[in-house]
C-alpha cells in the first residue's frame, strides 16, 4: 500500500478538497464555518468565513469557489475515541444555501437558498458541467424524530435559474458527471447505493419507472456490509470513486 503523509492537521471537519494549480488545496472546515487554503508545506489560511456549514466546494467557470452550505451541523465528540461527528442540524440552523466566494477578496455571495417554494435544506456536494452550470445534491437534515428527503438540483452560476432534477432521494451526497457528460452519478449516504441517471438536457434526466427503480436511477453498485457513501469523483476512464465511511476507504465502481 502507498504510504501516506500528513500535510496539515487540526482541521475542523474538513471536506470538499480542491487541488489548485499552485500546489495548494482549498477545502472547507464545516465545524469552523470556513473556506481554508492548505499550502504544500502545511501552512493554512482562511479565505472566507461564510458560517453555517460549508460542505462541498468546486471552482466555477469564472474562477470563483462555489460552496454547498448545509446551514450548520451539531457536532459531538466521542469520549472514548476523541473523534468528532455530526449528530443533527445546528441549533441556530435557518436554511441551506449555495454561495459564491471570491478567492481574491473572500467576499461571500448567496446565490440560492430555495427552489420555487421549497427551501434548500442541506446542500452537500457540487460539480460543474462543461457549459458552466452546476449540479448539486441536497442531503437534507436529520432531527431527533425525523429526517428530510433529499434531492438533486441544477443551477446557473449567476443566480438566475435553478431546477429540481431528482426527488426524493435518501441522503444524496456525492455527485459527479461521466467524462462524456451523458450521465450524472449520485451516491446516497445511508443506503450506500450509487445511482446513474441519463442526462437528457440542461437540468433534465430520464427516469426509470417503478418497480425497476425506486429512485428513477440505474443502480451502479450496492456493496454488502455496513458502510456509508460520501463524496465522489469520476476518473478520466469513467470509473467512479466514492469515499466510503465506516470501512475507511474508497469504493471504485465501473460505470
Where are the regions a protein language model picked out?
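Sequence-structural signature of mature extracellular/luminal beta-sheet repeat domains
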Residues: 1-255
Amino acid at each position: 500500500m502507498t504510504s501516506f503523509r500528513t500535510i496539515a492537521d487540526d482541521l475542523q471537519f474538513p471536506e470538499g478538497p480542491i487541488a489548485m494549480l499552485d500546489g495548494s488545496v482549498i477545502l472547507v472546515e464545516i465545524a469552523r464555518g470556513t473556506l481554508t487554503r492548505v499550502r504544500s508545506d502545511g501552512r493554512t489560511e482562511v479565505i472566507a468565513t461564510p458560517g453555517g456549514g460549508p460542505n462541498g466546494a468546486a471552482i466555477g467557470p469564472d474562477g470563483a469557489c462555489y460552496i454547498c452550505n448545509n446551514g450548520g451541523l451539531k457536532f459531538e465528540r466521542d469520549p472514548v475515541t476523541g473523534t468528532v461527528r455530526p449528530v443533527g442540524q445546528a441549533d441556530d440552523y435557518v436554511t441551506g444555501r449555495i454561495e459564491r466566494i471570491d478567492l481574491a477578496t473572500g467576499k461571500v455571495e448567496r446565490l440560492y437558498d430555495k427552489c420555487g417554494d421549497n427551501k434548500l435544506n442541506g446542500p452537500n456536494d457540487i460539480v460543474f458541467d462543461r457549459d458552466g452550470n452546476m449540479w448539486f445534491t441536497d442531503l437534507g437534515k436529520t432531527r431527533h424524530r425525523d429526517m428530510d428527503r433529499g434531492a438533486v438540483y441544477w443551477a446557473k452560476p449567476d443566480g438566475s435559474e435553478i431546477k429540481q432534477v431528482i426527488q426524493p432521494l435518501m441522503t444524496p451526497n456525492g455527485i459527479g458527471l461521466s467524462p462524456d457528460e451523458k450521465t450524472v452519478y449520485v451516491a446516497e449516504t445511508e443506503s450506500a447505493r450509487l445511482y446513474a441517471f441519463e442526462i437528457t438536457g440542461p437540468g433534465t434526466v430520464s427516469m426509470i419507472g417503478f418497480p425497476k427503480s425506486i429512485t428513477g436511477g440505474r443502480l451502479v453498485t450496492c456493496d454488502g456490509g455496513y458502510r456509508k457513501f460520501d463524496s465522489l469523483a469520476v476518473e478520466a476512464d469513467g470509473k467512479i470513486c466514492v469515499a466510503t465511511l465506516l470501512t475507511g476507504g474508497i469504493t471504485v465502481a465501473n460505470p
